[in-house]
Amino acid sequence: VLPVYVELLKALEEKGAEWIQIDEPYLALDLDDEQRNAIQKAFGYIRENTRLKIIVATYFDGLKDNADLAVNLPVEALHIDLARCPEQLDSILNILPADKILSLGVVDGRNIWKNDLEKSIELVNKAKGKLGADRVFVAGSCSFLHVPYDLALETKEQNLPAGIKRWMAFAAQKIEELAAIKALAGSET
């Protein structure tokens, strides 16, 4: 399967892609040595066969025992889910190699509720303080495919009362939250 995957990546590269994201929530599971070795080998093969910059995205939980594996994969950036597991930030900051970018999943892509901006900004600023702004990306915890598209389209008061609606954020609003966090934290990306 890997050679076919690399063919697809090369086609993207030929079309002008510079970055790709590989979602790997599997890294949040309990893995044995054989599974860890397979992941390392797969990413090594991809790295050897493409010049694309790669971000590996983990989500739905923390990296736990797979943190060392994840930070040492041959990729340019690592994405972690801080909405689900904010306590992993300190340990990741302490072991992240100096050449890696860290993407912080601070806006929850799994629910319809507004973000705690203060908490998210605190996490972003902690990472920026340790890594520098040029090595910190601000992102959703995972894809926003789990939430409805746009709260502005919910116009019927009887279906969604204003008192509840004001606490909600759908995908469009979550993108606005990301922009606000980026601006308020002064993040480069």
Locations of regions flagged by a protein language model:
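Domain-level signal for soluble alpha/beta catalytic cores
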Residues: 1-189
